[in-house]
Amino acid sequence: MQALIKISDKQYLVQKGDTLFVPRQKTDIGGTMEIASMARIDGANTVLNPAETVTAKVLGHVKDDKVVVFKKKRRKRYQSRNGHRQQMTQIEVVSL
């Protein structure tokens, strides 16, 4: 059985036991999150907007890979290099 969930305007197709990286959530490490399910997929049956929730356990808060932002204006000796690392939360789906 699979479920379609939405966290921070991003959709994820999850099963029990899946580990995902989602944008930073305000939940303590080791705590649980209740996420509303958008759809439940069970073989050939698909139920939209079920009254079920997905329970996920927070494994940790980490930073994503670095994204390099480079700006340059030709013939003007202007160069700017900046890096950005987005904060992410690692979660594990406990139950559907």
Swiss-Prot record:
Residues 85-96 have a biased composition (Polar residues). The keyword Transcription regulation does not apply. SUPFAM superfamilies: L21p-like. Residues 73-96 are annotated as: Disordered. One of its GO terms (cellular component) is ribosome. This protein binds to 23S rRNA in the presence of protein L20. Part of the 50S ribosomal subunit. Contacts protein L20. This is Large ribosomal subunit protein bL21. It comes from Chlorobium phaeovibrioides (strain DSM 265 / 1930) (Prosthecochloris vibrioformis (strain DSM 265)).
